[in-house]
Amino acid sequence: MDAAIGKVFDSVSDFFSGAASASADEFPLCDSDIISGCEKELAEAQDEGRKKECIMRLSWALVHSKMPSDIQRGIAMLEALVVNDTSAMKLREKLYLLALGYYRSGDFSRSRDCIERCLEVEPESGQAQALKKAIEDRIVKDGVIGVGIAVTAVGVVAGIAAAILRS
C-alpha cells in the first residue's frame, strides 16, 4: 500500500510541478486504499501548512477516484477551497482539479467554466489547455449524439404518421 501511495504522491508532485501528462484522458485513477491513506495522513497532520497540503492530496485523489461518490466529495472540497484562495498558483491548481472533477462527473458546462477561469490565471498551462480541448470535444460529441437522437425520433414519428395515413 505504501508503494501505491508513493506513486500517487509522485503523480501529485508531478501535477503541481507541471510535469504531469497534458492529456485529460490520461489522468491516473485512484482506488479506495489510496484515498484512505490520504485521509489518514490528513487526520495525523499537526500544523496548518501540512493540513493544507494533505487536503490538496486528498482532493486530488478524490477527483481521480473510480467512484462517482468520491469524485463528488472531491468537487465539494475543492469548491470550498477555491472560495478563500488568494494565491494565483494554488487557485490554478484547485480550478484545474475542480474542472477535472466536473469533467469526470459529466458536468461539462461547469467543467468548461472552471477551466476557463484556470486559463485566466495561467494562460500557458498545457494541462488546462488539453483539458479544455477534451471538454469542448466532449460537448461537441454529445451535441452530435443529441442531434442524431432528435433526427431519429422525428424519422420514427414521420414513419408512423405515414403508415397511419396509408391505412
Curated annotation (Swiss-Prot):
GO biological process annotation, one example: peroxisome fission
UniProt entry keywords in alphabetical sequence: Membrane, Mitochondrion, Mitochondrion outer membrane, Peroxisome, Peroxisome biogenesis, TPR repeat, Transmembrane, Transmembrane helix
InterPro entries documented for this protein: Fis1, Fis1_cytosol, Fis1_TPR_C, Fis1_TPR_N, TPR-like_helical_dom_sf, TPR_rpt
Membrane topology of the entry: Single-pass membrane protein
Role, per record: Component of the peroxisomal and mitochondrial division machineries. Plays a role in promoting the fission of mitochondria and peroxisomes. In association with PEX11C, PEX11D, PEX11E and DRP3A, is involved in cell cycle-associated constitutive self-replication of preexisting peroxisomes.
PANTHER family per UniProt: MITOCHONDRIAL FISSION 1 PROTEIN B (PTHR13247:SF13), TETRATRICOPEPTIDE REPEAT PROTEIN 11 TPR REPEAT PROTEIN 11 (PTHR13247)
Assembly mode: Interacts with PEX11A, PEX11B, PEX11C, PEX11D and PEX11E.
Name of protein: Mitochondrial fission 1 protein B
Organism: Arabidopsis thaliana (Mouse-ear cress)
Gene designation per UniProt: FIS1B
